[in-house]
């Protein structure tokens, strides 16, 4: 029996809990769903008897992304949904080609956290039917049902020896750029059409300070 949904994730911290919520909701509605890491060993069953009807991807910017997410994992698929995790962008990134989808990625469903993102993608040639405004899945963790799921401020301060009476400023980053050399940052900047030099420098400085 074919699988209804295959959900692929890249970064565990960024995506996995939200993917679990999505999987459970799909199963509650009677669908079959499976979660796999993008680079997991490939399974022939996903190209054949368990080939999913819908592939849910973590990113889908261009034909190369379609190749790595879709063809390499399940072969041809006509129903592709991108959870589109990278939506908090700078003005420069919003204006560039990379984050506005290219090639056949424009034919995939690109979920949007808000109307502004949907309007931007439509202005760059995407159909309205492929840019649904869904909100961000991870925001569901703020619902009352998840009270107590995360540690509160007092608990975290106690664990790390901080004063809970003080205001805390959190710098949230994967620090993915901290380990990249200048040539790698330059190549990424060229590919994305925006300059990541300053951001990479900040990542390195903060990363070294907390090692």
Pin down the residues of each PLM region.
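Conserved catalytic-core segment of nucleotide-activated headgroup transferases in glycan assembly
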Residues: 145-210
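Active-site and donor-binding regions of nucleotide-sugar-utilizing enzymes
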Residues: 3-150, 171-178
């Amino acid at each position: 029996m074919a699988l209804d949904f295959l959900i692929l994730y890249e970064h565990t911290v960024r995506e996995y809990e939200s993917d679990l919520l999505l999987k459970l909701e799909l199963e509650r509605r009677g669908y079959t769903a499976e979660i796999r890491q993008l680079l997991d060993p490939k399974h022939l069953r996903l190209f054949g008897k368990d080939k999913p009807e819908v592939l849910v991807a973590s990113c889908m910017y261009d034909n190369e992304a379609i190749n790595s997410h879709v063809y390499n994992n399940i072969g041809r698929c006509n129903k592709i949904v991108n959870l589109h995790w990278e939506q908090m962008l700078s003005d420069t990134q919003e204006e560039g080609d990379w984050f506005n989808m290219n090639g056949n990625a424009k034919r995939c469903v690109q979920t949007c956290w808000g109307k502004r993102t949907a309007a931007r993608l439509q202005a760059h040639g995407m159909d309205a039917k492929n840019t649904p405004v869904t909100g961000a899945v991870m925001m569901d963790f703020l619902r009352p049902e998840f009270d107590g799921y995360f540690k509160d401020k007092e608990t975290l301060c106690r664990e790390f020896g901080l004063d809970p009476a003080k205001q805390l400023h959190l710098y949230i980053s994967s620090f993915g750029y901290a380990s990249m050399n200048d040539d790698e940052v330059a190549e990424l900047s060229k590919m994305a059409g925006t300059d990541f030099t300053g951001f990479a420098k900040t990542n390195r400085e903060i990363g070294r300070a907390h090692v």
